[in-house]
């Protein structure tokens, strides 16, 4: 396929989705809330922000993302939030490994997760992070 540049095409659509706030869902009482529309909640296991995102994360979130897209296409209002399991031994070990305070190492890892998940095009409602 001559002239196909996936990075520019993906970047274009990611900017469109962000600009249109495509994956955001209004809460009751907010403009845009549709009371009669069926609701769905999709939540994958929360990742440990104790390192770099990897193909295992993509594998897990690809399934949840497919479910979220399927339900949207079938008329559901889908909440697909993001969160992190940032407590306990994995966070402590990562902080020790990086020589940083746990808050600093966790925040840096979360920033990398956000960057990578956006680049993958996962349909996360980032307002519900």
Question: Locations of the language-model features?
Answer:
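N-terminal, positively charged nucleic-acid-binding surface of large information/translation enzymes
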Residues: 1-129
